[in-house]
């Protein structure tokens, strides 16, 4: 068996006038994440972890932020396409563990929905998908509420 571990990271700036979408869940908040697509920081980190584990590059290689085709793209669609490409390369996704770092809003009420979306998009049982939420203890740009960051790890097997 060939086991592969991938690590993913993403960060986006919080700005007025955009919806806040994390893990495919629209979260009520006065600001949203700035980006070419829907800027779903969590799904972007997971997508990078999956592509990385399969040695298929990163999200930008597959879904460029300079390509008009991905303007406003739903990151759940991108995650499903990523999973299809990883599977086409001969891998099976085993699990995903992730962390979202945001000073605000509180994400705990939305974690179950995020996990359900990710599990559905990757074709995994819910118990193989984890999402954690942390603050940055008011330190740095995250602590000031200027942005939201996500980190993810994924295990693949061939």
UniProtKB/Swiss-Prot annotation:
Q: Is-annotated flag, keyword rRNA-binding?
A: no
Q: In which pathway does it act?
A: Isoprenoid biosynthesis; isopentenyl diphosphate biosynthesis via DXP pathway; isopentenyl diphosphate from 1-deoxy-D-xylulose 5-phosphate: step 4/6
Residues involved in a divalent metal cation binding: 10, 12, 44
User: Which residue positions does UniProt flag as site: Transition state stabilizer?
Assistant: 36, 135
State how it assembles: Homotrimer.
What PROSITE patterns does the database record attribute to this sequence? Answer: ISPF (PS01350)
Identify its protein family.
Answer: Belongs to the IspF family.
Protein's name according to its UniProt entry: 2-C-methyl-D-erythritol 2,4-cyclodiphosphate synthase
According to its UniProt entry, one GO biological process term is: terpenoid biosynthetic process
The UniProt function text for this chain reads: Involved in the biosynthesis of isopentenyl diphosphate (IPP) and dimethylallyl diphosphate (DMAPP), two major building blocks of isoprenoid compounds. Catalyzes the conversion of 4-diphosphocytidyl-2-C-methyl-D-erythritol 2-phosphate (CDP-ME2P) to 2-C-methyl-D-erythritol 2,4-cyclodiphosphate (ME-CPP) with a corresponding release of cytidine 5-monophosphate (CMP).
GO MF terms listed in the record are: 2-C-methyl-D-erythritol 2,4-cyclodiphosphate synthase activity; metal ion binding
Which organism encodes this protein? Burkholderia vietnamiensis (strain G4 / LMG 22486)
Give yes or no: UniProt keyword Methyltransferase: no
The record's disulfide annotation reads none
Q: Where are the transmembrane segments?
A: none
Under HAMAP family, the record lists: IspF
Question: Cross-referenced NCBIfam families, in alphabetical order?
Answer: ispF
Its encoding gene is what? ispF
List residues binding 4-CDP-2-C-methyl-D-erythritol 2-phosphate.
10-12, 36-37, 58-60, 63-67, 144
What class does this enzyme belong to in the EC scheme? lyase
Recorded superkingdom: Bacteria
């Amino acid at each position: 068996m060939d086991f592969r571990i991938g690590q993913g990271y993403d960060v986006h700036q919080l700005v007025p006038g955009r919806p806040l979408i994390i893990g495919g869940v629209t979260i009520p908040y006065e600001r949203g994440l700035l980006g070419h697509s829907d800027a779903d920081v969590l799904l972007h980190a997971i997508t990078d972890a999956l592509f990385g584990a399969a040695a298929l590059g990163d999200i930008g290689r597959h879904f460029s932020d300079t390509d008009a085709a991905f303007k406003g793209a739903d990151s759940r669609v991108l995650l499903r396409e990523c999973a299809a490409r990883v599977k086409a390369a001969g891998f099976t996704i085993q699990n995903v563990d992730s962390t979202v770092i945001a000073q605000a809003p509180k994400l705990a009420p939305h974690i179950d929905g995020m996990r359900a979306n990710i599990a559905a998009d990757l074709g995994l049982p819910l118990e193989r998908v984890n999402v954690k939420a942390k603050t940055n203890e008011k330190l740095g740009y995250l602590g000031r509420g200027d942005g939201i960051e996500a980190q993810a790890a994924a295990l693949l097997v061939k």
